[in-house]
Amino acid sequence: MSGASSVSSICSSNVSLIPTGPQVFINFRGKDLRKGFMSFLKPALKKEKINVFIDEQEERGKYLISLFDTIGESKIALVIFSEGYCESHWCMDELVKIKEYMDQNRLIIIPIFYRLDLDVVKDLTGKFGDNFWDLVDKYQPEPKKLHKWTEALFSVCELFSLILPKHSDISDRDFVKSIVKAVKKVQKNFFQRRNGEIEYQDFSVPACKLTITMHESPNEEAVQVTVLNEFYQMKNQSPVPSYEFKFWVDLTRPKGNVFMIDARDLSIAWSEDSNHWTWLPLPNQNSNESVMEIAFLKSASWLDVAGKFDTRYLTPRTRYEVVFVVKLEYTFEWETLVKLKLDLPNTWEKPQEQSVDMFDYISDQWLDIPVGEFTTSKKNVGEISFAMYEHECQLWKSGLFVKGVTIRPKY
């Protein structure tokens, strides 16, 4: 992609002929990446019947408009940042267009940092930064275009990302498994089946019935109820059906809707690899309920647990707190602080971020790790995202049990 003369310098991907779901557009740069990492990623996506597009055109300039149309027809974009990503102005132009479609709620972006640290991209440092400024010197873009390039880079870096650090021991094949899992999770939100046919849904409205069940009562006064949640009709949309879901109501709190997102419904890096995590049934469960599983960290050099929740299910004008429910066996590998992050729907508000010392949470009882707080209002209707992660320490961590995330009123 450092010019229009060779296939090796092309920024993106190949076409799968399996028309089974939303198209996935892959934006990347580099001959080495194409022959190495992409040789694992593309077949893995196709194996799961995921429709993938990778641009193979040699003469990029002639096909750029058509390529932009293809991006617009896609539902998911995988933006794969590597050290050589900024060697191509085609890649940067693609990224700008991808961001535009994301801002229009027409595209969901999954940023992937391949053998690259997030801060290197955000701060434009290291070889990645050198390549970016070399690109600027070479093409001398207009100030407006340069602003679009940097704005696209910084905006994408703020999204929930999959990161393979530069010196990580995790193999490309294992990293690909996490990417495929993330794509499949996003795909599930795009469609529902009616009479055997798939119908694509708008991103702003959940596509299927949501069931949120907390398997353990918060206290002796709590009871489980089933309710219907009537969604308001959004502008330029057809009436939206009611959605039935379950949650616990704490009778000691008049407004006490307590939501619990199980570990199985969170995104946990490497959780399907038995070398890193194992899934265990939660002890002392009610035999009449479906089995709830907890995740146990056996061994991993980095931690990444994240999830999302739609605030439309919450009580309006109520202060809520978000907490991870965990317990930790005694172990010395947790000497590096673990980071917590809460992103609210109103993008103009900065994410809530903090760090915690996991030694404070060593216990044989379930403990809450606070992530952040927010008040429900018309201004922040939409999806919140939360994460607990540690990507910097190369020590192999273990001994962490993850039960889930609780979202509850704070009084």
Swiss-Prot record:
It catalyses: NAD(+) + H2O = ADP-D-ribose + nicotinamide + H(+). Changing T150M: In strain: cv. An-2, cv. Bs-1, cv. Bu-0, cv. Chi-1, cv. Co-1, cv. Cvi-0, cv. El-0, cv. Gr-3, cv. Ita-0, cv. Jl-3, cv. Kas-1, cv. Landsberg erecta, cv. Lisse-2, cv. Lu-1, cv. Pi-0 and cv. Sf-1. Its EC number is 3.2.2.6. One of its GO terms (cellular component) is nucleus. It is an enzyme of class 3 (hydrolase). Changing D130N: In strain: cv. An-2, cv. Bs-1, cv. Bu-0, cv. Chi-1, cv. Co-1, cv. Cvi-0, cv. El-0, cv. Gr-3, cv. Ita-0, cv. Jl-3, cv. Kas-1, cv. Landsberg erecta, cv. Lisse-2, cv. Lu-1, cv. Pi-0 and cv. Sf-1. Keywords: Hydrolase, NAD. This is Protein PHLOEM PROTEIN 2-LIKE A5. The gene is PP2A5.
